[in-house]
Amino acid sequence: MTKPVITATTLVTEDGVPIDAVHLPGPKDLAIIIAHGFTLSWQRPRVWRIANRFNLAAGVIAFDFRGHGRSGGLSTLGDLEIMDLDVAVAYARALGYQRIAAVGFSMGSSVVVRHAGLIGGVDAVVSISGPGRWYYRGTERMRRVHYAVEHRLGRFVTRHYLKTRISPEGWQLVPVPPAEAAAKIAPVPLLIVHGDQDPYFPPEHARQLYLAAREPKELWLIPGMGHAEVACGNDLVDRITHWLDQAIRDPAPDAAAPDAASASERVPT
């Protein structure tokens, strides 16, 4: 059997930013769009491994956010990046995919949640190691991230050593936070995956997203898991793929807000 051809392409966002992307054709009508974490790229080994694993069961589109890798523009840390994801969703539709899922890691998690809540157009959302709110400085790792973003020296180091170009202007208006956007995702199914050993965002962020969201939703708090792509092993990728196949195939329940007391956490073992 001839192996499908991997296609690299450049997409252009609504505000004119060129986005470097790649398409891995899959065996089904399901496309999984990967939204990477801050300072990463679809070409980084940890992201490429996940893309290839998802590709065993679905088509995959991976791309570099603005200010990252070969994409143009400057990073706005999850604000304007929803337009980057939106052009990737449009690309998947143009390729003929009938079911589209957005899977985001860390910063990419905030993007997939905000995109689904504010713009829409996807059939399922997976948030992995994402924040529930902005400006969190409760861990040493996040204090370092804020220094890199807010100071000239930090942005210089990030540009030259991590190949990530950050907008020096900051946010003129504070974007809708992830938890607020999560409340608007239903009836699209939402899966929230978070490790109890995440050194950036503790599990409270996942619970904040979960409690804000309406059904259908699911929360996996995973013992021993760290943060984002590096902590997402092949077994977890496979379980997410299975969840996506079931969640998009099954009809969505009534989107009425559930009683918070009846909300359940599913903790994979």
What annotation goes with each model-predicted range?
Residues 1-26:
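N-terminal cap/lid segment of alpha/beta-hydrolase-fold proteins
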Residues 38-51:
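The serine-hydrolase catalytic nucleophile loop
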Residues 76-95:
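Alpha/beta-hydrolase active-site loop
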Residues 185-186, 192-194, 198:
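Short beta-strand/loop motif that positions the catalytic acidic residue
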